């Protein structure tokens, strides 16, 4: 009986050590490890408006945001700001680092491509993720890259991409909302130390504890290399906001990230916010 208990204990210890090792390997060390781009897109898909989207990504039970960029021991509140031009929207996700500094986390880029078609991607900011990380909706039921097989279904349409079917997001409630004639571009009213009454910051989790909580968001979103929403990106670029504080705090992590990226064969990204081809992340 004692031998059996020892054996079981050894197995448990081995599995725990293996899981810890894998978590360490998957972490990039960049702040972006603590924000789920896939989770943000899922919240955007669920939200009926940009205002509701802002509330969802800042809700503790959604497990999308685990960022503490200024190191004060509390989760950062993420503002949403819509930069728009004609049928193009760039929803900027931004954190107030201090009274005088802000930092962009990511931007959701949306373009209307027809009367009832639209394409969307979220792009993680280079200062937060180490490089631009692009994620889009996928009908494939698994995270994939541009070389994977194409999906199918009523919400998909071709974008002249030989290997992928790009999801039509026009019928997402929030997308329909922003294309209404009476829509006024959403600009979050909140700022440093002035936040909505329903929101209370919480202490950030360690990466190995946070990652399993947002793991399920990866299933219906693809990490891709192709930047499809080019007009929206041009609209956003002049408004990009960077924080000196964030760049200073992440200088070492950014250097390590670049070394790891340079060593990777074929230019594959480090895997903190997504996996390679054929693997769920």
What spans do the regions from the language model cover?
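Boundary at the C-terminal end of the N-terminal hydrophobic targeting segment
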Residues: 19-23
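Short N-terminal segments immediately surrounding and downstream of signal-peptide cleavage
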Residues: 24-43
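Soluble periplasmic/extracytoplasmic beta-strand elements of cell-envelope proteins
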Residues: 76-81, 90-94, 107-109, 119-123
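Low-complexity segments
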Residues: 98-107, 112-272, 276
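Extracellular/luminal recognition modules and glycoprotein regions
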Residues: 39-59
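Bacterial N-terminal signal peptides
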Residues: 9-18
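Bacterial N-terminal signal peptides that target proteins for export
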Residues: 1-8
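Acidic, glycine-anchored loop motifs typical of Ca2+
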Residues: 65-77, 99
């Amino acid at each position: 009986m004692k031998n059996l208990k020892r054996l079981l204990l050894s197995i448990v210890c081995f599995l725990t050590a293996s899981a810890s090792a894998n978590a360490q390997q998957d972490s990039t060390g960049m702040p972006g490890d603590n924000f789920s781009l896939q989770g943000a897109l899922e919240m955007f898909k669920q939200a009926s408006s940009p205002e509701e989207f802002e509330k969802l990504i800042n809700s503790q039970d959604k497990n999308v945001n685990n960022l503490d960029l200024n190191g004060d021991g509390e989760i950062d509140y993420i503002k949403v700001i819509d930069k728009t031009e004609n049928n193009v929207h760039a929803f900027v996700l931004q954190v107030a680092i201090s009274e005088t500094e802000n930092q962009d986390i990511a931007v959701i880029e949306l373009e209307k491509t027809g009367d009832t078609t639209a394409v969307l991607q979220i792009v993680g900011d280079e200062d937060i993720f180490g490089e631009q990380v692009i994620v889009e909706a996928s009908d494939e039921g698994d995270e994939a890259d541009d070389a994977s097989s194409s999906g199918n279904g009523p919400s998909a349409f071709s974008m002249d991409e030989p290997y992928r079917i790009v999801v039509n997001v026009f019928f997402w409630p929030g997308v329909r909302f922003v294309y209404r004639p009476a829509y006024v571009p959403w600009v979050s009213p909140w700022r440093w130390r002035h936040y909505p009454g329903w929101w209370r910051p919480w202490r950030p989790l360690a990466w190995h504890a946070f990652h399993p909580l947002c793991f399920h968001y990866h299933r219906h979103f693809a990490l891709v290399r192709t930047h499809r929403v080019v007009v929206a990106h041009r609209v956003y670029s002049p408004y990009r906001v960077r924080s000196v504080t964030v760049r200073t705090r992440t200088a070492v992590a950014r250097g390590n990230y670049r070394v790891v990226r340079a060593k990777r064969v074929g230019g594959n990204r480090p895997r903190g916010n997504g996996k390679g081809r054929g693997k769920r992340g």
